[in-house]
Structures are given as structure tokens and as C-alpha cells.
Amino acid sequence: MLVLTRKMGETITIGDQIRIKVVEMKGNQVRLGIEAPGDMRIYREEIYLKVQKENQLAAAWSLEDLESAVNFAGAGKE
């Protein structure tokens, strides 16, 4: 892992298309501004991990589980 020290207003450049700028510092929090291509997904780590976990749970459903859920949901429609 590369560890860098930056001051307010200073920027880190990653490759040709990504720039990370220190926008604000309050106590123990740092606000970062990120410039990147629109098709690049950028997540806070806690959100990224949650999405990964939910995707894994959804992928673990079997065809039988899905059929049961569909049958259950449609049971009261008649």
C-alpha cells in the first residue's frame, strides 16, 4: 500500500483519468473530491462490502427457492 501525506487543496493523480483532492478537513475527518470517468463506479468501502454481500446472498438462491417465492406471492391473487 502506498501511503501519502497531503495538505488542504492538494491532489493525488492515479493514471491519466483519476484525481483525488483534499477538499476539507474537520477534526478526524477528511473530505475528498474525486474526478473520474463517468463509467467508473466509486463506492465508500462499507457500501461496497454491503453490496457484495447482498449479491452473494442473491446468487445463493436456488431455482426451487425462487419458484417457491413466486408461488407464495401469487397465492392470494385469485
Curated annotation (Swiss-Prot):
GO terms for cellular component: cytosol. The keyword Mitochondrion does not apply. GO terms for molecular function: mRNA 5'-UTR binding. One of its GO terms (biological process) is negative regulation of translational initiation. It is found in: Cytoplasm. Homodimer; the beta-strands of each monomer intercalate to form a hydrophobic core, while the alpha-helices form wings that extend away from the core. A translational regulator that binds mRNA to regulate translation initiation and/or mRNA stability. Usually binds in the 5'-UTR at or near the Shine-Dalgarno sequence preventing ribosome-binding, thus repressing translation. Its main target seems to be the major flagellin gene, while its function is anatagonized by FliW. PANTHER family: CARBON STORAGE REGULATOR. This is Translational regulator CsrA.
